[in-house]
């Protein structure tokens, strides 16, 4: 369990408490609210409805639990995720039965793939109506079983405190994840003698946080023998609040670090050992580090297909140390030499401690580090200007990052804007980057930003969103306006489903089937008018010289949400890129430009063109440095 998570009770801490008061007679609905209060759930996101209405009466009276009324249950789920990602605490959402519950399925699945601690409480039709196809009946337990860490149906009102305490414990411990608690309406209305703390019993659930000493010793031995090691860092390091331990271990050993999309910020991007983000749209230096490594030290990462590319050709010469809190992840994709089950924070601390105590000689890896630094310098982040006066989206995001800085929280949905944000925002601190990494959910950014602001009200929160994603959940801007969450939206508006269009350009001969979202030259919808109608201040930007003043103006407004509609060129693309299913060794820095790794043959048709292009890049870098 991480430090932030320890602020919320677990069965161990709950069971150790004495009873503070005699049993109190109350309804199941009131027991739900009282349990949330005891579990320190300070905010919940939801929408009332018939099957959950009993809960909303005692919730109205609660002085400890704030309810945020969203405009769609998907917004409630993503807001709970945003809250959880920023705070490290359990995010809570509430919905009624049937369509209310099914509207939570997408954010639950999203939280499951990104290992987010969430508890979803759903109302259900009365027990006597179950299985009769009653009005607004849906088997939400069956529907969500594949995408939850666990789920419950409470059939006895006396079990409500236990079920909720167990749900919170399951959500936050071990590998975090979503837990659903489904409660029929008659159980909410029935009475019980409320007793806290409840008796808790989770047979077979014993997550391991402390790594085995022998595995740590084996890992340290491999690390000492490696000539080209790399720390492959995933989101589990952020979940464990292990950023300080990671930095200490990397600096002591001098091992270069790559951070996945879900781990951005856990290791400062400005650090000389940081080689960037690996994966389909990662940096050449990060991809090269993995491909040419002789030892991968994978901490809290799951070898996602977007990182590995073609698994058979991924890191072909590397031995693997894989440390993860979830034993099911170890060896799932790649065979490993040293499996380590444990919390990332404890694993890194033990690795450092054992490394310092080791008397064995270690290899000099300075040449390896210099090689990767050379790749990083030769292939820096960059972009092409758009034709005419059209804005380059990368310029917008780069300007935003420079102006707002690394203390803010940045959220993104999925698509080109997500990748540009990952590339052009400078992440220096953990829990400052929220995105839908595993499920790739359009519409994630706005409600997640709302939840992030709820969890960190003193932080500046920016949602970097695309116009396609924005049209799915922009109604939550009204929630933000009414509830007092002054988030900022940087809307990257290219009038298209940008990532789909990019693939159609590259792989479908430019046949743009159903990707254009508006007619050329029209503002449809007019996001300025729309946003103002939703309770926001709205600004439209069409020229480069307007970008910075608009961002500065947005930062001055803190009494309502602000939307900046950046009109950008539709032909901007995300580079570098590894085509789906291809080897990471075939990464393209730009279209047709495949870098060399260690002098290997290029996959390009004409190596001479590659050399010329690389020379031009080198000259440009030298000119910039001069």
Curated annotation (Swiss-Prot):
Residues that bind Mg(2+): 467, 494
Segments for region (Disordered): 1-23
Record SUPFAM superfamilies: DHS-like NAD/FAD-binding domain, Thiamin diphosphate-binding fold (THDP-binding)
Enzymatic reactions: 2 pyruvate + H(+) = (2S)-2-acetolactate + CO2
Residue positions binding FAD: 175, 281-302, 324-343
Enzyme class: transferase
GO cellular component: acetolactate synthase complex
Protein name in the entry: Acetolactate synthase large subunit
Lineage start: Bacteria, Bacillati, Actinomycetota, Actinomycetes, Mycobacteriales
């Amino acid at each position: 369990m991480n430090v932030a998570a320890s602020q919320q009770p677990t069965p161990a801490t709950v069971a150790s408490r004495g009873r503070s008061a005699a049993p109190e007679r109350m309804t199941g609905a009131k027991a739900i609210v009282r349990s949330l209060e005891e579990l320190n759930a300070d905010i919940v996101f939801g929408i009332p409805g018939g099957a959950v209405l009993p809960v909303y009466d005692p919730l109205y009276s609660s002085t400890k639990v704030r309810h945020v009324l969203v405009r769609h249950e998907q917004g409630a789920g993503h807001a709970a995720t945003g809250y959880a990602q920023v705070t490290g605490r359990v995010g809570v959402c509430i919905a009624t039965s049937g369509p209310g519950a099914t509207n939570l399925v997408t954010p639950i699945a999203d939280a499951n793939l990104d290992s987010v601690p969430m508890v979803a409480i759903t109302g259900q039709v009365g027990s006597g109506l179950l299985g009769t196809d009653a009005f607004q009946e849906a088997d939400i337990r069956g529907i969500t079983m594949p995408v939850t860490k666990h789920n419950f149906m409470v059939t006895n009102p006396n079990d409500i405190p236990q079920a909720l305490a167990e749900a919170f414990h399951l959500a936050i411990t071990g590998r975090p994840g979503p837990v659903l608690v489904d409660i029929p309406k008659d159980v909410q209305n029935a009475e019980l003698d409320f007793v806290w703390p409840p008796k808790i019993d989770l047979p077979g659930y014993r997550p391991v946080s402390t790594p085995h000493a022998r595995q740590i010793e084996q890992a340290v031995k491999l690390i000492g023998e490696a000539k080209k090691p790399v720390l492959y860092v995933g989101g589990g390091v952020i979940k464990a609040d292990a950023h300080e331990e990671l930095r200490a271990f990397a600096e002591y050993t001098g091992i270069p670090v790559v951070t996945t999309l879900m781990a951005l910020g856990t290791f400062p991007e400005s650090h000389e050992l940081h080689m960037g983000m690996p994966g389909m749209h990662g940096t050449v230096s990060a991809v090269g580090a993995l491909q040419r490594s002789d030892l991968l030290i994978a901490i809290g990462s799951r070898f996602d297909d977007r990182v590995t590319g073609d698994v058979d050709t991924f890191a072909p010469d590397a031995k693997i140390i894989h440390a993860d809190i979830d034993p099911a992840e170890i060896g799932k994709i790649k065979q490993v030499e040293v499996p380590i089950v444990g919390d990332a924070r404890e694993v890194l601390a033990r690795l450092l401690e054992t490394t310092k105590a080791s008397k064995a000689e270690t290899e000099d890896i300075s040449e390896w580090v210099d090689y990767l630094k050379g790749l990083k310098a030769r292939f820096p982040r960059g972009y092409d200007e758009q034709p005419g006066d059209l804005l380059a989206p990368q310029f917008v995001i780069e300007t935003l990052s420079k102006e707002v800085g690394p203390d803010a929280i940045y959220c993104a949905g999925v698509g080109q804007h997500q990748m540009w944000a990952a590339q052009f925002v400078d992440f220096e601190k953990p829990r400052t980057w929220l995105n839908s990494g595993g499920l790739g959910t359009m519409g994630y950014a706005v409600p997640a930003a709302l939840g992030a602001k709820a969890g960190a009200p003193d932080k500046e929160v920016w949602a970097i969103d695309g116009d396609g994603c924005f049209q799915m959940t922009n109604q939550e801007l009204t929630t933000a306006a009414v509830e007092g969450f002054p988030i900022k939206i940087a809307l990257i508006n290219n009038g298209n489903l940008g990532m789909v269009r990019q693939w159609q350009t590259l792989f479908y001969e430019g046949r743009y089937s159903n990707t254009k979202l508006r007619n050329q030259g029209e503002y449809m919808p007019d996001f300025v008018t729309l946003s103002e109608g939703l309770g926001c201040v709205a600004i439209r930007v069409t020229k480069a010289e307007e970008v910075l003043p608009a961002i500065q103006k947005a930062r001055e407004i803190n009494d309502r949400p602000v939307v900046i509609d950046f009109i950008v060129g539709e032909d901007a693309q995300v580079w570098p890129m590894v085509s789906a299913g291809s080897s990471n060794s075939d990464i393209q820095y730009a279209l047709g430009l495949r870098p060399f790794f260690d002098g290997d043959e290029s996959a390009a048709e004409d190596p001479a063109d590659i050399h010329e292009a690389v020379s031009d890049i080198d000259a440009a870098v030298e000119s910039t440095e001069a």
